[in-house]
Amino acid sequence: MEKYIIKLKNKVLREKEISYEEALNLISLDTNNKNDFDILLKSANEIREYFMGRKADLCTIMNAKSGKCSEDCKFCAQSSYYKTGVEEYSLLDYNEILNRAKEMESKGVHRFSLVTSGKGMSGKEFNNILNIYEGLRENTNLKLCASLGIIDYEQAKMLKSAGVTTYHHNVETCRDNFHNICTTHTYKDRIKTIKDAKKAGLDVCVGGIIGMNESEEQRLKMAFEIRELNVKSFPINILNPIKNTPMENYDVLEPMEILKTTAVFRFIIPNVYIRYAGGRLSLKGYDKVGFNGGVNSAIVGDYLTTVGSGIENDKKMIIEQGFEL
């Protein structure tokens, strides 16, 4: 396997794309074989350094509207289909959001994203969030991101005009597995949102969740489908099973499995920010190994309904791995 890993690494470094079959062979690697596993991580790191350098990108998210979601995504604490006890509230007011944004900026965060529950936004609520973004643009130097569910082209244009630079919208899983994760909207709906955001001139941040009982083949399919979308950022969430959701009893992925997956993703999509997102605590401290194995960015602070890592601890750890912030 060692020679095969190096062969594929050299192919990527010649700026050639690896095939699905090649990635399938790569992900079959046994993580108990320390030599092969170390070479995989080292190779992913070389690819990251060649294409992306040593700049790490840190973002933070704010749960600007929580709970009561009409969609039935089986992993999600905010779906109205499941009694998870999640805090429920409408869109937060501008001053509360601005104070949080300024706090994050003072801690050295580069990007700030508002995330809202629900299938999408419209009418007065959407106008309110446009006004909030205009205020954030005027009163901070943060790069502004949005994660507001399904939007159309006109909404994407308005978000861009209000100061948003990046739209985040995960595919969650691959096309042929999506119906097992959500039935109230389609994979096609999500792809349309991503394409409309790009058409409006926004960068896109598109990732998914691993650990939802998908196969390794399905994980790879997701990565290849995301590669076709030409994204700037690829956030990797690790399922954190939430009580009273259909996935509450799913096993949490082992750290070595997560590290192997993110390393192979770097071979597939070499020129993006591969970003640790929700569920990172599943790595049990091995996240710093990932920063030497293809990962080069992170959501810092807490997530939507789960606890994350401290921002100062994250910055220290990332700098210690040789990155610049």
UniProtKB/Swiss-Prot annotation:
Obligatory cofactor(s): [4Fe-4S] cluster; [2Fe-2S] cluster
GO molecular function: 2 iron, 2 sulfur cluster binding; 4 iron, 4 sulfur cluster binding; biotin synthase activity; iron ion binding
Enzyme Commission number, as recorded: 2.8.1.6
InterPro entries, alphabetized: Aldolase_TIM, BATS_dom, Biotin_synth/BioAB, Biotin_synthase, Elp3/MiaA/NifB-like_rSAM, rSAM
Amino acids binding [2Fe-2S] cluster: 113, 145, 205, 275
CDD domains: Radical_SAM
Top-rank lineage group of the source organism: Bacteria
Record-annotated disulphide pairs: none
A biological process from GO: biotin biosynthetic process
Transmembrane parts of this sequence: none
Pfam families per record: BATS, Radical_SAM
Record key words, sorted: 2Fe-2S, 4Fe-4S, Biotin biosynthesis, Iron, Iron-sulfur, Metal-binding, S-adenosyl-L-methionine, Transferase
Pathway annotation from the record: Cofactor biosynthesis; biotin biosynthesis; biotin from 7,8-diaminononanoate: step 2/2
Radical SAM core domain segment(s): 51-280
Cofactor: how bound: Binds 1 [4Fe-4S] cluster. The cluster is coordinated with 3 cysteines and an exchangeable S-adenosyl-L-methionine.
Xref: HAMAP family: BioB
Function: Catalyzes the conversion of dethiobiotin (DTB) to biotin by the insertion of a sulfur atom into dethiobiotin via a radical-based mechanism.
Protein's recorded name: Biotin synthase
Protein source organism: Clostridioides difficile (strain 630)
